């Protein structure tokens, strides 16, 4: 069962679901909460390695990833980021999300931005029960024009689905969870698998 706007407001007021900063009422509509672009990002360098062999050693994968992904960069509040056509970049949400063990979150891009060619997540739109932290967005510009992105703009929407029972192994309690308590823009940790 997906939570309605009334349910979301109730879960937030009872602190069963935590979103910081606390969303204004006008951001909670239908079955979603609008979320915003944070000011932290990482971009991908062009032509620093020819490929990443995902079947290679963990050490080689980590080395290759470090060659292609920038360090985390922090923008000032109104400083723009230019996402060129065909470019991939990682951003964090402004909001920090905490989900209880009986709720799964779903991230969806905004239709108005998709119509300009902006994909805000490349396939990873599930937020596991027990999650705590920022959400990293994988931006891809599939359009023909450079998109100018500024921290604080509405960038995506979250919806929430109630599970039949709380999960036994929530995300932040599992030792192998690569992104638990994520703060900022954490790049791929596929080499930890």
From Swiss-Prot:
InterPro entries: dCTP_deaminase, dUTPase-like_sf, dUTPase_trimeric. Belongs to the dCTP deaminase family. It comes from Buchnera aphidicola subsp. Schizaphis graminum (strain Sg). The keyword Hydrolase applies. Catalyzes the deamination of dCTP to dUTP. This is dCTP deaminase. The active site is at residue 138. Its EC number is 3.5.4.13. The keyword Metal-binding does not apply. It holds the Pfam family DCD. It comes from the Bacteria. DCTP binds at residues 110-115, 128, 136-138, 171, 178, 182. Homotrimer. GO terms for molecular function: dCTP deaminase activity; nucleotide binding. PANTHER family: DCTP DEAMINASE.
């Amino acid at each position: 069962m997906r939570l309605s706007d009334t349910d979301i407001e109730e879960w937030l007021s009872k602190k069963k679901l935590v979103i910081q900063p606390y969303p204004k009422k006008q951001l909670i509509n239908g079955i979603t909460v609008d979320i915003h672009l944070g000011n932290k990002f990482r971009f991908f360098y062009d032509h620093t390695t020819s490929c990443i062999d995902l079947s290679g050693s963990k050490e080689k994968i980590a080395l290759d990833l470090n060659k292609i992904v920038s360090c985390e960069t922090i923008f000032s509040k109104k400083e723009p980021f230019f996402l060129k056509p065909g470019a991939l970049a990682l951003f964090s949400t402004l909001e920090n999300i905490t989900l209880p063990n009986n709720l799964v979150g779903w991230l969806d891009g905004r239709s108005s931005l998709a119509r300009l060619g902006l994909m805000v997540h490349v396939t990873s739109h599930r937020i596991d029960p027990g999650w705590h932290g920022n959400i990293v967005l994988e931006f891809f510009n599939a359009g023909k024009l450079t998109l100018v992105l500024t921290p604080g703009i509405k960038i995506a929407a979250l919806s929430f689905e109630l599970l039949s029972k709380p999960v036994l192994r929530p995300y932040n309690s599992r030792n192998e969870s690569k992104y638990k308590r994520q703060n900022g823009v954490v790049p791929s940790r596929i080499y930890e698998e």
